[in-house]
Structures are given as C-alpha cells and as structure tokens.
C-alpha cells in the first residue's frame, strides 16, 4: 500500500487479539522522526539503536586503523576497501536515507524490573553499500549471513543460517531470480510468464503462482500445487489477505 501522508504518523498497532505495540520516535538528531523505541502490551520496552551511513563509515575507519596499527591483530578489514560517508539518494527500491537498525535492546521488563541485559537481543552489520551483511543473536553468535552482487547494489546472491550450507541465487538480465541452489537440499528453477511464475524443484515437481496487481500491490491470487490441488486468495484494496480457499 502507498505510504501515509506526511502529516499522519504511525504511533501504534493493535491486532485482532488486542495485543499492542506503541512506537516512540526520535525528536532530534540524525535519526529524528525514526522509530527508536517500542513498548509492547506486556509493558516491555525496547530500544532500537540506529546508525547513519556516516557513522558506520567512521566506525569502519577506526576499526581499519586499529587493525593496521596492531601486528598481532588479524587482517579482517581490507585496507583497500572504500566505505563512503553517503549512499546514493535514490535506488530502484525508492529513496534511501542511509539509516539502518544496528541493535535491539530490552530496556525494561516488568517481570524482572531490576535486571538489565548487558548485551542486545540482536545485532546487525552492513556492507559499505548499506546492505545487510550479518545478524547476531544475544550471545554474539552470527546466526545469518548474506552475500551480494558487486555489480548490482542490493542483489543478494547467497545467504546462510548458522550451521547450515549456503544457498545461492542466479538472476536473469532483468534482475529476476531464475535459480536457487541448495547444496544439501532441493534446488529450484523459476520461469516467468504473463502474470504467472512457474517453480520447478530438482525432483521435477512443479508449482505455478498466478498474480494480479502491479508494483507493491501485486499479490498471488492462485497457487497450483505439485499434486494438482489449487489454493485461491482474495485481497482488499490495501493488499491485505481477506479470504483463502484451499482444495478441500
């Protein structure tokens, strides 16, 4: 759906079960207007630590200087890598202000009011181009990693979960995924037609997705499963699922 007008600011969400999320925004500074805090229905408060591209570039330069000045430290940071202070203002996905989520902290839990975590619940690192590089859990262990095409900003060519083999992706000239390769699992091929996508796995099973709409409102309205059954879906004007009919 299209973004709300500038004078309308999202302050909270309530789901069908009455559970709430209240959003708190920074009033000033480099991330003014961005959500930097969340309070859930149980009264727990979370701090969202945000960084700008300039802040990440400065941190990179400091890390590189430390690495180069210490003979004992591993050369994990390339001395030739460029980390710009700014990102291109516009991308094929829309405007990019360079602000990224760096960490999520639990700052208050009514069930344990006297306990404060000493580490974030999750932490995120990014490439010099602002792409998500890795996700770390509260123990500091990397749980996800991503690799991108050096010639196409934002195009993910591989990702992996901790302890699992890396999945890789191939694209056509228009930037659509044509193949997903999983070393210890099924591989998938993707073929694109008019308002449809055909997915075939390495066991030659096929599914077909039929779509309607354009841009951000494009939705799958029918799915033909490998066993011949069909699932149909209906959406409202905002693109939200309102009904689904399965083979039964």
Where do the model's predicted regions map?
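Extended charged/polar low-complexity repeat regions
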Residues: 1-248
